[in-house]
Amino acid sequence: MRALLAIIRCDLLLVIRRKSEVLTALFFFVVVTSLFPLGIGADAALLRKIAPGVLWVAALLSTLLGLQRMFAADYQDGALEQLALSPQPMVLLVTGKIIAHWVVCGLPLVILAPIIGVQYDLDVSSLYVLIGTLLLGTPVLSLIGSVGAALTLGVRGGSVLLSLLILPLYIPVLIFGAGAVYAQSVGLDASGHFSLLGALLILALACVPWVSSAAVKIAIE
């Protein structure tokens, strides 16, 4: 546990020193989600209808922006090789990096999304559902993304390949996350979508760290 916290703290300190990387993803999310109300106009019914899809797609793409850097810096300076030689299990170190990525790229979106949701005339209950789906869904995005980030380590044009690998795997999260918000906005029960998102999160937590750690080991060998 001490090693896990050390990895998280180290990654967060590095992010604080490179604030522009985090701000770029947040700025992208805010700009993309704010352009739709400006382009569509004051049609509240239409804005409520498109809000779940727009907000979730923007969150997905914003998360994707920071994935390439999850392991890249440590790979380039040799830190990953040193971590692999440490007595701590690689899966623990990879988990720390995934958590740090979510804190930096996912958690700010959870905080910002309700504010953006007001532009789409979402009611309070829909905003609560939006927060809940993002809390369940964004960790899944970071977990799945870690596999792509590990598989593309040291690969030329890795960012393009990463997108091609990861985006199809993001589709279930997008469907269930946006579907829950839409169901709530039209007065339907969103509990089924929450259950499916929770199942995806549990499955990802159980499998992905081991897959990512194996991919990292292959990349550094």
Segments the model singles out, each with a brief description of its role:
Residues M1-A25:
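Aromatic- and glycine-rich beta-strand/loop motifs that create alpha-glucan
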Residues K19-G41, W56-A59, L165, L169-F176, ...:
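Hydrophobic alpha-helical transmembrane segments of multi-pass membrane transport/permease proteins
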Residues G39-I50, P114-L135, L153, V181-F194, ...:
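Membrane-interfacial helix-loop-helix connectors in multipass membrane proteins
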Residues A51-L67:
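Long, hydrophobic alpha-helical segments
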Residues L64-A84:
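Transmembrane helix boundary and interhelical loop/hinge segments in multi-pass membrane proteins
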Residues T95-Y120, V140, I144, G177-A178:
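Hydrophobic alpha-helical transmembrane segments that constitute the membrane-spanning cores
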Residues Y128, L135-L167, K217-E221:
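A structural motif at transmembrane helix-loop-helix junctions in multipass membrane proteins
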Residues L205-E221:
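Junction motif at the cytosolic side of a transmembrane helix
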